Amino acid sequence: MRRRQLLQRLMAGVMLATGLHLPAFASIEVAGVKFDDSVTVAGKELKLNGAGLRTKVIFKVYAAGLYLAEKKTTVPDVLTTSGPRRVSITMLREVSSDEFGKSFMEGLSSNTDKVERTRILPQTMKFGEVFAQIQTLKKGDQMLLDWIPGEGTQCYLNGKKLGDLMPDVAFYNAVLRIWLGDKPVDSSLKPALLGER
């Protein structure tokens, strides 16, 4: 394993030195969290589009990765892509579910208009019930937010399914805009998820 990492770093160094670029889809590490270059959601292979770090003030809160069927570099392309999608979040510090939920709602409100918020209100309330089941998100906890076409949004915590499916794609896209919208919760995370870093 160590030899493989050394070889990957050596190859990356050679590629940088010679002006070559790493492939668009490659596994990366963010703050000690490894994001695989591909995952399977609803029987479809998704590739890592980008990954980055969510910070608040000076604290590293979580590492997040976005998985899509093919590379997308603009927000409209990400939001209109067909097929499954995944956001993977790994906590880097302990956060109460109240604090995480509040940040989630602020991000949602900042990046949706009143009509959208009204449309997705029932699903937003369901999602709130999911957070009510969790006292604390601990360092190392992994949350997955999957969009499964024809079914809906499914949330997992450490591999365990949480809550019911939320069927409207508008809800999933509103969740994505927490990180990719005009007022993202972390301005440096947005370009990272779009693969710009």
Where are these regions (language model features)?
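Flexible glycine-rich active-site/ligand-binding loops centered on an Asp-His dyad
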Residues: L162-L189
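Mid-length scaffold segments of soluble, non-membrane domains
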Residues: K72-G150
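Sec/Tat signal peptide C-region and signal peptidase I cleavage site
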Residues: L22-A26
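N-terminal export leaders
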Residues: R3-M11
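N-terminal structural module
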Residues: S27-T81
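Short strand-turn-strand beta-turns centered on an Asx-Gly dipeptide
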Residues: L157-G159
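Bacterial N-terminal signal peptides
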Residues: M11-H21
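Cysteine/selenocysteine-centered motifs that mediate thiol-based redox chemistry or coordinate metal-sulfur cofactors
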Residues: S187-R197
